[in-house]
């Protein structure tokens, strides 16, 4: 028997449609349009009730199959008279003949979307309630229609309803259009199955090590970017199953389109700014901080963050953990800035910033609901870890161990706590000098801690005297702390834990410098 052949045009007129949806957005417009075009409607459950309520003729599936919906709606469309009508390949004479012999009418269009499983899980529902929202008949219909796209059009999104009515008027979808719809349908069911499988693996198969045996995620293309990290690299933005929340779902209020590097730097900036409870501003370039500060308000925090390294801040990315005030907007408008991101903007602030033609202004909700784990791809796999936050036991100054010198005053301890928190935003090896709630010198990304100390002191200049220092990991030798001490640093906070801690402690004691151990490390790569 020869293989069935379809031409690219190959329109199939839409005369009979099976409609069974959970999300009834714009369904009324769709079914009215189908009815007006003379399309026979077959439907189930709530969809059929809606159609009947509009006074439109509809054949209920139970009347089609001769078998009632049962088990609280768990069984509706799982019947040969339904699936044969969906799966028959009408390019094959044998299939057409079998339908005739069985008395089954084929469907030209299937419109279906699925129970809200992911949303039910997110609502905090019980396991039984979640299981009840696992759709069975819906995915079966969707997959059947998608498989048989040479003969059937499958629509899974209300956003396609206008296309459906246009296709009806044009004599049906073309084969190429049906292929696109089928791809969307399989994407729809694949994402659904990944969500169900992931939930089952994490809920019903507890792992002794705390990590499920299966972890899955799906991403949807949100934008094609001009290029990647460099102009010769193609790039795109995809959103995860959270529905486009977080930075990926930020609202852009002004400016050129976001670039790959803009996203990387903005993500790092938000990470730094939201580590603080007080009004805070972080200025980032190449994913490293040019300056971080807290203040009585965001304008003060921005001034002080900018003062840390004004040269590097030129062309940087700014993140704020509070609404941007008019005063801060005026300050930002005086400096070339690539991106500013904030939860909101006071009246008049956006208009001031819009005076800079190319600045990208983003509004992005607080990251409180963002995921607790993060991924990093490696060759052949992916690394998954719990996201690092400043919430470990050792991040609380009340738990620190005084290793050298006198206990810090309340003011110095507050600066140490600030420096410790801010240091987490710098790439390892990281040393951060701070004074009065603002960074004054940052050394980061060096392959030895001594060079990071030198870099931090060099950038701080005269401001190093009287400042405090934080190190994201322990000092392996006393040479790093000695550089800080010689520059006039009065107190140091570090994790401790080196086999040579006593040498570091002795150097601090000899200089009368206070040193605390946190017992917590904050590497950042």
Swiss-Prot record:
**InterPro entries named in the record:** AICAR_Tfase_dup_dom_sf, Cytidine_deaminase-like, MGS-like_dom, MGS-like_dom_sf, PurH-like
What the entry lists under CDD domains is as follows:
IMPCH (cd01421)
Please tell me one Gene Ontology term that the record gives under cellular component: cytosol
Q: Which Gene3D superfamilies match?
A: 3.40.140.20, Methylglyoxal synthase-like domain (3.40.50.1380)
E.C. numbers: 2.1.2.3, 3.5.4.10
Q: Which UniProt keywords apply?
A: Hydrolase, Multifunctional enzyme, Purine biosynthesis, Transferase
Please report the stretch or stretches of sequence annotated as the MGS-like domain.
10-156
What's one GO BP annotation on this UniProt entry? 'de novo' IMP biosynthetic process
Q: Extract one GO molecular function annotation from the record.
A: IMP cyclohydrolase activity
Q: In which pathway does it act?
A: Purine metabolism; IMP biosynthesis via de novo pathway; 5-formamido-1-(5-phospho-D-ribosyl)imidazole-4-carboxamide from 5-amino-1-(5-phospho-D-ribosyl)imidazole-4-carboxamide (10-formyl THF route): step 1/1; Purine metabolism; IMP biosynthesis via de novo pathway; IMP from 5-formamido-1-(5-phospho-D-ribosyl)imidazole-4-carboxamide: step 1/1
Q: Which PROSITE patterns match?
A: MGS (PS51855)
Please name the Pfam families in this protein's record: AICARFT_IMPCHas (PF01808), MGS (PF02142)
Q: What is known of its domains?
A: The IMP cyclohydrolase activity resides in the N-terminal region.
Would you identify the family this protein belongs to, as annotated? Belongs to the PurH family.
> Could you identify this protein by its name?
Bifunctional purine biosynthesis protein PurH
């Amino acid at each position: 028997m020869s293989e069935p052949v379809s031409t690219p045009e190959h329109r199939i007129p839409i005369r009979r449609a099976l409609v069974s949806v959970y999300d009834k957005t714009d369904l009324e417009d769709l079914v009215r349009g189908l009815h007006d075009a003379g399309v026979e409607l077959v439907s189930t459950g709530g969809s059929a009730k809606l159609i009947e309520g509009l006074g439109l003729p509809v054949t209920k599936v139970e009347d089609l199959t001769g078998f009632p919906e049962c088990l609280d709606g768990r069984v509706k469309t799982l019947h040969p008279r339904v699936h044969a009508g969906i799966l028959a390949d009408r390019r094959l004479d044998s299939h057409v003949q079998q339908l005739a012999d069985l008395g089954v009418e084929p469907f030209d269009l299937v419109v279906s979307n699925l129970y809200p499983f992911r949303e039910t899980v997110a609502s905090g529902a019980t396991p039984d309630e979640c299981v009840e929202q696992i759709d069975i008949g819906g995915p079966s219909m969707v997959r059947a229609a998608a498989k048989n796209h040479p003969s059937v059009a499958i629509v899974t999104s209300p956003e396609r309803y206008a296309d459906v009515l246009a296709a009806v008027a044009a004599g049906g979808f073309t084969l190429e259009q049906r292929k696109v719809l089928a791809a969307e349908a399989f994407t729809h069911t694949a994402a659904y199955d990944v969500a169900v499988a992931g939930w089952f693996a994490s809920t019903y198969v507890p792992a002794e090590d705390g990590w499920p045996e299966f972890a899955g995620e799906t991403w949807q293309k949100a934008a094609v970017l001009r290029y990647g990290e460099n102009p010769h690299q193609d790039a795109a933005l995809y959103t995860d199953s959270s529905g486009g929340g977080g930075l990926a779902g930020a609202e852009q209020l002004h400016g050129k389109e976001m670039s790959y590097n803009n996203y990387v730097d903005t993500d790092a900036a938000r990470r730094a700014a939201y580590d603080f409870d007080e009004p805070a501003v972080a200025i980032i370039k190449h994913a490293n901080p040019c300056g971080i500060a807290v203040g009585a308000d965001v304008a003060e925090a921005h001034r002080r963050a900018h003062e840390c390294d004004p040269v590097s801040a030129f062309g940087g990315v700014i993140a704020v953990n509070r609404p941007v005030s008019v005063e801060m907007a005026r300050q930002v408008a005086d400096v070339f800035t690539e991106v500013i991101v904030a939860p909101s903007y006071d009246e008049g602030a956006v208009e001031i910033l819009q005076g800079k033609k190319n600045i990208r202004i983003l509004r992005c909700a607080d990251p409180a609901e963002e995921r607790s784990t993060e991924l990093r791809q490696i060759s052949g796999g992916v690394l998954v870890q719990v996201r690092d936050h400043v919430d470990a036991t050792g991040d609380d100054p009340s738990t620190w161990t005084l290793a050298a010198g006198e206990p810090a005053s309340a003011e110095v301890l507050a600066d140490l706590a600030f420096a410790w928190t801010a240091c987490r935003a710098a790439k390892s090896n990281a040393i951060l000098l701070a004074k009065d709630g603002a960074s004054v010198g940052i050394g980061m990304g060096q392959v030895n801690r001594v060079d990071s100390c030198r870099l931090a002191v060099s950038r701080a200049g005269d401001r190093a005297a009287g400042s405090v220092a934080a190190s994201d990991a322990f000092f392996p030798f006393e040479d790093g702390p000695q550089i800080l001490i010689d520059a006039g640093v009065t107190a140091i906070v570090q994790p401790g834990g080196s086999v040579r801690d006593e040498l570091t402690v002795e150097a601090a004691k000899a200089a009368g410098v206070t040193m605390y151990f946190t017992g917590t490390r904050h590497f950042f790569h």
